């Protein structure tokens, strides 16, 4: 009996010693910041996570990854930093701060932040068969200090003002405002992303008069709330082209009618023919005007059909204004050609019938 009791005591002591020397995996949780961490483009950002209850994580596997577990941003395993499995673009830009690893706290530092770094990061701890993770989120922000306002030459439709700004992240809010701070609906708005995924913004506004006073191009970063704006004052003289074009067209039409109808009236009186005669100068003058109108309309339709641009295209507004200007030029050119043809025809006809 004494021998059996002594053997049991020795077994109990050995088992206790083994439990003391062999570390056991305990349950734990991982805590991280609940709110997103803001990171300025080109700066540095730090993401921390902590074991709970606090305990040493030196012997654990610590893995930071984005959306794929097998493609870590940073990997710490068996007391070493392993760069072989790390995504190549993070190898030179990440560092794991382990000053408090004895308490279960580590910090991932990302250098030279780019727009690609925006999003979620998984902080993963593994101890034997026990593992837990927490998710941290990075919000990358970039604000451009350069805003350009361009004024295109006025045409019959009005004055086109365009605002451009490059280098924003994420996509900013963009709008036109008048001198009273009221929002002016834009004629068009578009954006694109460059190779660094930064947003290039473009917005246009077609003005028919100067009732808005000075106008402001306003941009706002939705994450930081930072605002940038540029204003411009438009002179009333820029909006006088509409009436000028109308006067020019009216004058040209009046001259056209004069040059066509006067010779035809003279010939009508000279020949004393009825207006219903197919060869009468009156009908010929009307025929020249009608033919010219058909040619002008045909050229206008052809011009617009061959240069059509989808409404969604960034150049739609500019192309539309270009087509309108070309249409006016075609009308003016055809009016002069018609005047010349009519003048030559009636003069020659009158000359040969003297």
From Swiss-Prot:
The keyword Membrane applies. The chain crosses the membrane at residues 243-263, 283-303, 326-346. GO terms for molecular function: signaling receptor binding. It holds the Pfam family V-set. PROSITE patterns: IG_LIKE (PS50835). GO terms for biological process: regulation of cytokine production; T cell receptor signaling pathway. Residues 161-233 form the Ig-like C1-type domain. One of its GO terms (cellular component) is external side of plasma membrane. It comes from the Eukaryota. It is found in: Membrane. The keyword Cytoplasm does not apply. CDD domains: IgV_MOG_like (cd05713). Its main location: membrane. Expressed in the thymus and skin. It is a multi-pass membrane protein. Keywords: Disulfide bond, Immunoglobulin domain, Membrane, Transmembrane, Transmembrane helix. InterPro entries: BTN3A2-like_Ig-C, Ig-like_dom, Ig-like_dom_sf, Ig-like_fold, Ig_sub, Ig_V-set, IgSF_BTN/MOG. Disulfide bonds join 49-123, 163-217. Residues 23-141 form the Ig-like V-type domain. May act by engaging a cell surface molecule on immature T-cells in the embryonic thymus. All hominoid species have a common inactivating mutation, but that Old World monkeys such as olive baboons, green monkeys, cynomolgus macaques and rhesus macaques have apparently functional SKINT1L sequences, indicating that SKINT1L is inactivated in a common ancestor of hominoids. Belongs to the SKINT family. This is Selection and upkeep of intraepithelial T-cells protein 1. The lineage of its organism: Eukaryota, Metazoa, Chordata, Craniata, Vertebrata.
């Amino acid at each position: 009996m004494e021998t059996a009791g002594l053997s049991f005591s020795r077994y109990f002591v050995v088992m206790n010693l083994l439990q003391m020397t062999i570390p056991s995996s305990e349950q734990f949780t991982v805590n991280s910041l609940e709110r997103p961490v803001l990171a300025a483009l080109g700066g540095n950002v730090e993401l921390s996570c902590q074991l709970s209850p606090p305990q040493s994580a030196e012997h654990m596997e610590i893995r930071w990854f984005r959306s794929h577990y097998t493609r870590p941003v940073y990997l710490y395993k068996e007391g070493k930093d392993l760069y072989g499995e790390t995504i190549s673009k993070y190898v030179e830009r990440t560092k794991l701060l382990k000053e408090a690893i004895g308490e279960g706290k580590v910090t991932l530092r990302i250098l030279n932040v780019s727009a690609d770094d925006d999003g979620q990061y998984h902080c993963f701890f593994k101890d034997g068969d026990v593992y837990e993770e927490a998710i941290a989120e990075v919000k990358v922000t970039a604000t451009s200090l350069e805003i350009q306002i361009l004024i295109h030459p006025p045409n019959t439709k009005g004055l086109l003002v365009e605002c451009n700004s490059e280098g924003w992240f994420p996509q900013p809010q963009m709008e036109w405002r008048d001198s009273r701070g009221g929002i002016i609906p834009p004629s068009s708005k578009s954006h694109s992303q460059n190779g660094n995924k930064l947003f290039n913004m473009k917005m246009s506004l077609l003005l028919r008069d100067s009732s808005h006073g000075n106008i402001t191009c306003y941009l706002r970063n939705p994450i930081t709330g930072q605002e940038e704006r540029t204003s411009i004052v438009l002179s009333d003289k820029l909006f006088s082209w509409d009436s000028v074009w109308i006067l020019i067209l009216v004058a040209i039409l009046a001259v056209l009618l004069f040059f066509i109808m006067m010779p035809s009236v003279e010939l009508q009186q000279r020949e004393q023919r009825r207006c219903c005669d197919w060869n009468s100068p009156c009908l010929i003058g009307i025929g020249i005007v009608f033919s010219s109108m058909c040619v002008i309309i045909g050229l206008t339709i052809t011009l617009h059909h061959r240069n059509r641009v989808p409404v969604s295209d960034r150049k739609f507004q500019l192309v539309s204004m270009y087509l309108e200007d070309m249409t006016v030029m075609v009308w003016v050119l055809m009016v002069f050609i018609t005047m010349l043809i009519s003048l030559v025809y009636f003069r020659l006809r009158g000359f040969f019938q003297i």
